[in-house]
From Swiss-Prot:
Protein name: Uridylate kinase
Keyword Nucleotide-binding: yes
NCBIfam families: pyrH_bact (TIGR02075)
HAMAP family given in the database record: PyrH_B
Function field: Catalyzes the reversible phosphorylation of UMP to UDP.
Length: 249
């Protein structure tokens, strides 16, 4: 009889950038990437992990960019929130086609499109093994989807925020510019701030730090990386309260 792998986490908040959905399309959503991610998330449900999900909207719209060009920042951020809802609808559809129960909850009311965000219902769905997708950020302008991920992670009492990126984790320098950059295995929140390592925006990062919510940074484009992270294998970088820095060989 085949035994089910034991996960390192009971409940996670998975944060994906909107750009992660682009694939080779250059803009919008690549259906092949969406389906691959849905299958990776399905593998987590199959080992008993409860999954909350926040997706950015940068593949469709970036409010901050147009704000610099003169658009009112509040209007731009509202448009960005709607972009995250579009990504959430696409992911919900991909999950359901992969036979994974999922609910889409929006921080702004969109009757007939998705559910309103409700903390108690979200917890209930998670306990039932349903993937809960949190869309529209925090519902407020001037807050990023990274802030939304940390906020929802704290609210649902996630064991960690898993941040899927284009790189293998957190490095001591930009790996694109410095081929000798070292990858951290574990690092303390304070050292990330002191070294000015780019993980997420300051508001999101300090929120996670103040609530002792670990952040795990990994490469979502690497096949199987998400599964390895959840199973506690040596993948990516963990940011938490710790006294020593652990670098990978």
């Amino acid at each position: 009889m085949k035994t089910k792998p034991k996960s390192a986490y009971r409940r996670i908040l998975l944060k994906l950038s909107g750009e992660a959905l682009v694939g080779e399309e250059g803009f919008g959503i690549d259906p092949k990437v969406l389906d691959r991610m849905a299958l990776e998330i399905k593998s987590l449900i199959e080992v008993g992990v409860q999954v909350g999900l926040v997706i950015g909207g940068g593949n469709i719209f970036r409010g901050a960019g147009l704000a610099e060009a003169g658009m009112n920042r509040v209007v731009g951020d509202h448009m960005g929130m709607l972009a995250t809802v579009m990504n959430g609808l696409a992911m919900r559809d991909a999950l359901q086609r992969s036979h994974v129960n999922s609910r889409l909850m929006s921080a702004i009311p969109l009757n007939g499109v998705c559910d309103d965000y409700n903390w108690a219902k979200a917890i209930r769905y998670l306990k039932q093994g349903t993937v809960v997708i949190f869309a529209a950020g925090t519902g407020n302008p001037f807050f990023t989807t990274d802030s939304a991920a940390c906020l929802r992670g704290i609210e649902i009492e996630a064991d960690a925020v898993l941040k899927g990126t284009k790189v293998d984790g957190v490095f001591d320098a930009d790996p694109a510019k410095n081929p000798d950059a070292k990858l951290y295995k574990e690092i303390d929140y304070q050292l990330v701030l002191e070294k000015e390592l780019k993980v997420m925006d300051l508001a999101a990062f300090t929120l996670a730090r103040d609530h002792s919510l670990p952040i795990r940074v990994f490469n979502m484009n690497k096949p199987g990386a998400l599964n390895r992270v959840v199973l506690g294998e040596d993948e990516g970088t963990t940011i938490k309260h710790c006294e020593t820095i652990i670098e990978k060989e």
